[in-house]
Amino acid sequence: MSNVIIFTGTHFTPALAVIEEIKKKEPWEIYYLGRKYTLEGEKIPSPESQILPKMGVKFIPIPAGRLQRRFTRWTIPSLLRVPFGFFKALKVILEIKPKVIVSFGGYVGVPVVIAGFLRRVPILIHEQTATVGLANKISVRFAQKIAISFPESKTFFPEGKVVFTGNPLRPEIFKS
């Protein structure tokens, strides 16, 4: 059986940098469990749903609900989608049997991380910002390692789980 890795989350650019590097160096079968559309209520395809299939990465949309801090017209429909996202993620994890899950934060990553934890799949979370978002605050309980971009972020996470990696960058950023 091949090595299977799942990427997830809504911080797509750093995830893409890691995916591109893995594709160059390792023979992993890569899946991305992400959002189908950019915003709730709009039918604009997400960048990950458009870019990754062209790279040979298997994109699977997860109908996860956003955990909102304010009540809006999307709050109730979004909360109702939370269990659907979890069960879809669990189904995918049971089918493809990943060796590891890498989450780049955001609401879509939470059900994938929890489902992976329940199936005893090792979880790595990457936090791109100096302060921790709600999704990573939830997901950190289920992760074995947390990669951080800023040293000051380590105060938000349990000791022994944190690895300072910086923010993954794509080589194109250095080209003029």
Go through each PLM region and give its residues.
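Active-site-proximal region of nucleotide-activated glycan assembly enzymes
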Residues: 2, 29, 117-176
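Conserved nucleotide-sugar phosphate-binding/catalytic loop shared by glycosyltransferases and other
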Residues: 7, 21, 28-81
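Histidine-anchored nucleotide/phosphate-binding helix
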Residues: 14-24
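Glycosyltransferases and closely related glycan-assembly transferases
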Residues: 24, 87-101, 109-124, 137-142
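An aromatic- and histidine-rich active-site surface loop
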Residues: 12-16, 40-42, 47, 101-119
